[in-house]
Regions:
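Extended, subdomain-level signal for the structured scaffold at the beginning of enzyme domains
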Residues: 3-108, 120-130, 140-186
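Short, thiol/selenol-centered motifs that function as redox-active sites or metal-ligating centers
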Residues: 114-118
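Anionic-ligand binding patches
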Residues: 133
Length: 186
């Protein structure tokens, strides 16, 4: 309702040169479900995807280096979205506190929505072992070698984690994300 504050908050964790579809669609889709949404990346303000679209980044990934801000972000958000983008993930997976954030988020059983190369962050966060995980076909071996069971499906659910291999299945993926979120598995 207009004028009332939304209570649910989603955080999209990415870096410049993200896969455009995988940021733009979830950004608007979560708002349709009543979430406020912020993008956390390597710089504040306008950031660009690999196809040239842009979004406004309102949170800095470097905030996670400050323990008070780390905890604030952990407590402020209800849903974590990890989009793909090969170059973006190469940089983001080098940010140790971003990886620690994902691991702690998972430990708290909060919902994680991950798509395409975003699975590389799951691997680097060491949360894939023993789980069903999907991701882009070119990282299938990486997913399997991390101890996960690679599943090539549009919306792979493993407890609080919902993963997807490709943006062509974003509709099914986001539907599953909201089901997991609402069920309390996240």
């Amino acid at each position: 309702t207009k004028g009332t504050k939304m209570s649910k908050k989603a955080l999209i964790l990415t870096w410049e040169s993200y896969q455009d579809h995988e940021v733009v669609y979830p950004f608007y889709r979560v708002q349709e479900e009543g979430f406020e949404v912020d993008i956390m990346a390597n710089k504040l303000g306008r950031i660009f995807g690999i196809l040239g679209t842009y979004n406004e980044c309102t949170q800095s990934v470097f905030d996670l280096d400050d323990e008070k801000l780390f905890e604030k972000h952990m407590n402020d958000y209800d849903l974590l979205i990890i989009p793909g983008g090969v170059k973006a993930l190469e940089y983001l997976r080098q940010q140790q506190n971003a990886l620690r954030f994902i691991k702690e988020w998972d430990t708290k059983k909060k919902t994680i929505a991950c798509i395409c190369h975003g699975a590389q962050l799951l691997i680097s966060s060491k949360i894939t072992s023993g789980r069903d995980v999907s991701g882009y076909y070119s990282i299938k071996d990486d997913i399997s070698n991390s101890g996960a069971n690679y599943v090539d499906g549009p919306a792979v659910i493993s407890n609080n984690l919902v993963s997807c291999p490709h943006y062509k299945w974003m509709g099914q993926w986001m539907k599953a994300v909201f089901e997991v979120y609402e069920s309390g598995n996240g």
